[in-house]
Amino acid sequence: MKIAVITFPGSNCDSDIYRVLKDQYNAEVDRIWHRDGLDKKYELVILPGGFSYGDYLRSGAMAGFSPVMKSVKEHVDKGGKLFGICNGFQILTEAEYLPGALIRNKTLKYICKTVILTKGSAGNPVTASMDVRKELKIPIAHADGCYYATSDVLKQLEDEDRILFRYSGENPNGSLDSIAGITSKNFKIVGMMPHPERAMNPITGEMDGKVVLDLILGS
């Protein structure tokens, strides 16, 4: 699989996802600087975590206007897959690839901890192979991770099976309906706040990130 990992000024998780894809999936991965375009056809483009453009204005707000996003739009228009992790999810909502917004955590504090995720919508094809009873331990690290949307959008996400994951038990950031990740209507654009790339090695304590990335890469 050919994958592009976009690096914006302030990205700090691009190396993590790049190494995971290279070392554990043997994928063909290119790192793309935000001023450059996608000079080849990729099956998947990843917007990594971090603090793109220093989170000025709002988290992810400025990255949507970065030069590389023109190529990302062309990639999406041709049916390519797009995956945003944490700040990448914020970028996807700011650029209106996904509905809703990621706002300040209910605690008004930065949160860095491992949370429990469960399957969201039963009919979402991305997580179709995941047992509805399975719980995943995945880290979060954000200050603006509270998913917010209007009641109409929340109903649409439910009706269209577009909720990828929910927080189970504790809702760490106050996300409406405990939403931790969602997909586009065609399920080719995926955004989530937790970091699967940080749960890929027993040295760090968790391995459930592999379950998540297997689902994303296999969908």
UniProtKB/Swiss-Prot annotation:
Residues 2-219 form the Glutamine amidotransferase type-1 domain. One of its GO terms (cellular component) is cytoplasm. Its EC number is 6.3.5.3, 3.5.1.2. InterPro entries: Class_I_gatase-like (IPR029062), PRibForGlyAmidine_synth_PurQ (IPR010075). It is found in: Cytoplasm. Pathway: Purine metabolism; IMP biosynthesis via de novo pathway; 5-amino-1-(5-phospho-D-ribosyl)imidazole from N(2)-formyl-N(1)-(5-phospho-D-ribosyl)glycinamide: step 1/2. Keywords: ATP-binding, Cytoplasm, Glutamine amidotransferase, Hydrolase, Ligase, Nucleotide-binding, Purine biosynthesis. GO terms for biological process: 'de novo' IMP biosynthetic process. Gene3D superfamilies: 3.40.50.880. Part of the phosphoribosylformylglycinamidine synthase complex involved in the purines biosynthetic pathway. Catalyzes the ATP-dependent conversion of formylglycinamide ribonucleotide (FGAR) and glutamine to yield formylglycinamidine ribonucleotide (FGAM) and glutamate. The FGAM synthase complex is composed of three subunits. PurQ produces an ammonia molecule by converting glutamine to glutamate. PurL transfers the ammonia molecule to FGAR to form FGAM in an ATP-dependent manner. Part of the FGAM synthase complex composed of 1 PurL, 1 PurQ and 2 PurS subunits. This is Phosphoribosylformylglycinamidine synthase subunit PurQ. It comes from Leptospira interrogans serogroup Icterohaemorrhagiae serovar Lai (strain 56601).
